Amino acid sequence: MDGGIYLYFIIALISSAGILFYYLSYKSVKQPKTDILFTDALNAMVRGDKAKAIGILRQVVKQDSNHVRAYLQLGNILRDENTEQAIKIHQSLTVRPNLSAEMKVDIHRALANDYKKIGSFYKAKNEAEQILTIEKRNLWSLKFLVDIAIENQNWDEAASWTKQLQKVTGKKNKNDEARFDVYRGLDCLKNSQLEEAKVLFQKAIKTSPNYGLGYRYLGDVYEQTRDLLKALENWKIFAQKDLAGGAIVYGKIESALFDLGRYSEVENFYRKILELDSSNLEAIIRLANVLDEKGESVAALQ
């Protein structure tokens, strides 16, 4: 009897172990670990399969509601088609306890992109500034704040954030400083504040002599104040320093030379441009027109 009971106990134990093994095996097949699923979602994102990635990420958060990074990526994917939903998801993550500094940065970064997507630049700016309270030298945040300031045409802020960015990177770009002075000058020009605009354009030139836009718009100021000689001088400098964009003042230069009785200098101007950039199509065409007006062969271009 005792032997029968013992045998029965052994059989029951083996059966229980078998059932447990089957259950665990079945569960592992039917419910893959969330880290594996998350990797699958990332792979789907890389392939551009957003629908599959969303489906997998929803499966991840259903299995593990504490998988913050899965929620984060889910919101990032939804941003393009359902930005409000993305914002709700990302905002809900800000109150999660025990978040690492890295995770907090990623959440605020996601929200900054969300708000920028819907044109809420004030909130986007606040989120980027939140990142700087966590990481004072965060390059992404500083670049983002520069971009936001430029989009809002807030040139003082753009210049300020640019200087902070340059301090962090250790790379000073005088063209950036000059660019914002030019933008300030353009604001003055729009408001007919010619003297203020002139000072800012001159400041831009002094800051970065090789940055062409300062010369272009300083020429425009002189044009409005009827100082055609100085206007011409600055336009020509701009055209030679910005070979790609200089064509925009070619017409002004031709008109100024004509009004000054110096139209014969047009040919030399375009030849100078072609010495600097032999493939400048606009200069080639205009020089051909000048030669044609003079009755000279286009072969004289050579």
Explain the meaning of each model-derived region.
Residues A70, M103, I107, S141, ...:
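TPR alpha-solenoid repeat register
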Residues V61-K62, V95, E129-T133, K167, ...:
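Conserved structural position within tetratricopeptide repeats
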Residues S65, N98, E102, K136, ...:
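Short coil turns that delineate tetratricopeptide repeat
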Residues V46, D80, K117, E151, ...:
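Register position in tetratricopeptide repeats
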